[in-house]
Structure formats: C-alpha cells, structure tokens
Amino acid sequence: MPTNWLLPESIADVLPSEARKIEELRRRMLDLFRTYGYELVMPPMLEYIESLLSGTGHDLDLKTFKLVDQLSGRTIGLRADITPQVARIDAHLLNRAGVTRLCYAGSVLHTRPSGFHVTREPLQIGAEIYGHAGLEADLEIQELMLAALSAAGLADVRLDLCHVGVVAALLEQSPIAARIQDDLFTALAAKDVPALRAITVDLPPAQRDAINLLPALYGGVDVLARARKQLPALPAIGRALDDLATLAERAGGATVNIDLADLRGYHYHSGVMFTAYVAGVPNAVARGGRYDKVGEAFGRARPATGFSLDLREVAGISPVEARAAAIHAPWSGDAKLREAIAALRAAGEIVIQSLPGHPEDLEEFAYDRQLVEESGRWIVKPRNASI
C-alpha cells in the first residue's frame, strides 16, 4: 500500500471546516489589533540562525529547524517564534524613537511539539508594544490578549500572573546566582521543592528561605498580601507586587491567579508575565509579558511587551460558527444570470453555482438564499426546502 500521502508526526493538513474557522478568527483578531493602532508586519519564514536566536535562550534553539543556505553556505533556521523577528524589525529596520505598536500572524515550525496533541506547525498571532517601559504598556497588552480571546468566543478565562523581578531581586548580588540560575528557574517552574532546597543550599539564609517560599505563593489575588508579609521588604519586590496587583485589578472578567514560581520563558522575560487558560484545556491558550532585553542583540535595546497565541489551537476550542451564509445559483449560460451573480459577488456575497450533475454541499456553506428567475429577471429569494 502506498504511504507517500503520510505527513510527518505532529504535522497535519488544515481542512476546509477548520481553515474557515482559523481564517475567521485571524481576521477578527487582526481587525481588533488595528482598532488599537497596531501595524501589521510580515517577517520571513527563514533567517540566518544568529538573528533568529538572538536574545532568546536555549529553549528556542532546541525548537528551531536548521539547514545550510545553498547561496551563502551559512546556517539558516526556520522560525520557531515570530517575536524575535518583530523585535529585529523594530530595532533595526523601523528605528523609531517613540512608541511602536506592531502585530503579526504567520506559521512557525517546531522540531518537537510543545505538549500532548499539539501541532509542530502553530499559526502564531500576536501583538507587541515597543518604546514604553511603564506598566501602562503591559496593561494594554493584557487587555488586548483578553479581548482577542473574547473575540474567539472563549469564556471562563483564567489569567495566571507572575513577575521575574521577584526572583531577580532575591538573587541580586549573589556570587553564585549565575551558576545556579538555570537549575533554579527550572525547579521553580516545576515547583520541585526538594530540588529547590538542594540548589539553594549555598545561598545566604534570608535569600534561600525566601526562594523556597515561592512555590507556595500560588493562588488568588490574596497571595500578594501573603507575599508582602513573607518575602524580604526589598524595593524591587514591592514594585513587582504592586505591578501584579494593578494587572489583577484590570483583568476584567477573567479569574486571576498569582503564581510567583511560574517562570517559564525566563531567558528573555524581564518583568511581568501573564498566561491565559480556559476551562477543559490543559495547555495555555495565550502567553505574554515584558522582554526589554531582546532588542540588545540587534544593537538597540528598547522596552518591549507583547503576547501571542496559536490560532490553530484556539480555533479547535472556539465556539465561533464559521459556516458562511451563501446564495445558491443554478448552472446556466444565461447572460443575465452571470450579470446578477457578478453584481452580488462585487457586493461581498458568496454565490455558488451548482455544476451540472452535482448537488450543492450543504455542510460547507449555509445556503440561506437562492437566485431564481422571475419574468426574465434573476432575483434573490429565501431558500426553499428544495431547489
């Protein structure tokens, strides 16, 4: 039996019903971003590997497919994340002095899936603000992320908030911080308390005790009050907790959880981090946060904050109905019929002619009207039980 139709593991075609929903959501979200003043950019699918991985850490390196460019002999990569590309555009190509709002939508490719039943070819859509270091930009991005999920019809959103500044303040001036950082953040993200105790054993007692408290500082907004009592009264920690409190207040109808140990993506995040979940879905549906240092690799450090989500994943759980209303027309050589169809299509209507011998596909389109001839004129009428 031939197997040349098989696709690689965790790679799949997008069939019409799914593609319709994905495209509907893509349009809704990009239109939403435009109402906030975000400009669309379209980075290339591949770049030199040094550019793709600049300032992103080891995780993205492992996710990136690499190959040799036959023109230059240099190593190039297929993008695994569009965010660094947009940072490059802001830092090197646009070179604006003030605030820049950019958005994007495009496929990325991963060497390995990021979870169970997850595609290796996500369709990433997102938005970024460059040039403003204040919390106002983070508030706008959080609002936009929640609005995008609302546009997809997703309810019962849970928003998990974290801040890299808490751990950074606890590790500041520690002579062993650089040596233990990777293992420390991995243990925190996994809430692996025994590993955390082993990793922090050589830290000063005050720092060690505070870091070992972080996995337990998880729950509702009341966690912030507990954190103020239990963590050292350092100015940087106070500012981080204040930022989280403000973000929680502005979360709209989302349920807010505080998780001071959820530091996935710490390699490039530099401040607040937010992750969105919906009921019944184990994986996060959207992620965002501040990453002020990514632009440094392109010669121009700029304050930056943004979010992204996978349209394919969101479409799979969205209740949005994407079946388009359509007008059915018979197949005929009548010039007046062709003129009527052309006029309707010019007005934005979907008009589908049944080819001879082939009934219309009622599953793909919602035929609610039909073109019928009356007294030599073709007019649109509500669809009857049969055509």
From Swiss-Prot:
A GO biological-process term: histidyl-tRNA aminoacylation
Principal subcellular localisation of the protein: cytoplasm
Location within or outside the cell: Cytoplasm
Pathway of action: Amino-acid biosynthesis; L-histidine biosynthesis; L-histidine from 5-phospho-alpha-D-ribose 1-diphosphate: step 1/9
GO terms under cellular component: cytoplasm
Alphabetical list of Pfam families matching this protein: tRNA-synt_His
Key words, A-Z: Amino-acid biosynthesis, Cytoplasm, Histidine biosynthesis
This protein's record includes keyword Cytoplasm: yes
GO molecular function: histidine-tRNA ligase activity
Annotated family: Belongs to the class-II aminoacyl-tRNA synthetase family. HisZ subfamily.
PANTHER family membership: HISTIDINE--TRNA LIGASE, MITOCHONDRIAL-RELATED, HISTIDYL-TRNA SYNTHETASE
Note: This function is generally fulfilled by the C-terminal part of HisG, which is missing in some bacteria such as this one.
Quaternary data: Heteromultimer composed of HisG and HisZ subunits.
Record's protein name: ATP phosphoribosyltransferase regulatory subunit
Native source organism of the sequence: Ralstonia pickettii (strain 12J)
